[in-house]
Amino acid sequence: MKLSDIKKVYGSGSLEVPVLHGINLQIEEGEFIAIMGPSGSGKSTLMNIIGFLDYPSAGTYQLNGKKVNSIKENQLAELRNKHVGFVFQQFFLLPRQNAWKNVESPLIYAAIPRRERMNRAKEMLAKVGLEDRVNHLPNELSGGQKQRVCIARALVNNPEVILADEPTGALDSKTSEQIMELLVQLNKEGKTVIIVTHEEEIAAYASRVITLKDGMITDDRRRAHEHMGEL
């Protein structure tokens, strides 16, 4: 992924609100990146552009050498479904569907057979420690459990890239550690992991930390994983 002079402006005319100011960023396959910065710095907007949820107002976004910032919405949706798993700060769970049906939802669009969808969804729920909650509705789950369902949903389509906006925000410290270790393991397996966080202890799991302020990158540093031993 390569972002060149990416700008994002919301509104128009006298109501224009610039959010990103000329972002230049190259992301290599298999990186583990944390994006940090104060509220309003543009972190989530940048993540939305990286994850094909939003178009930049100006600049060039390349994926594997191909420009993607000017492709049609249906092609953008296909890229999202095939390449990216999302974990949002809000849960976005279907209130009338149980945990495994929420987790399987990305697979429906990929035309995966029902039995395989169910098996993969339950496998992912077990991976995040919810094997005993597969039939529970969202209103029967705690906030932390809901967030883990979201993480399982992000993993179920076996994406190349995992984008997580405050992935541990609703979790206690022990569960946060388990979730981050899971993301570390997925990164070891070759997945690119990009998280937005305001917590230094969560960013410490990443090997590269990018800091935004007022829509600009003010720091981009690489470091050894503090929680990953030899990696």
Residue ranges and their predicted role:
Residues 216-231:
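Conserved beta-strand-loop-alpha-helix hinge in the C-terminal portion
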Residues 1-212:
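ABC family nucleotide-binding domain
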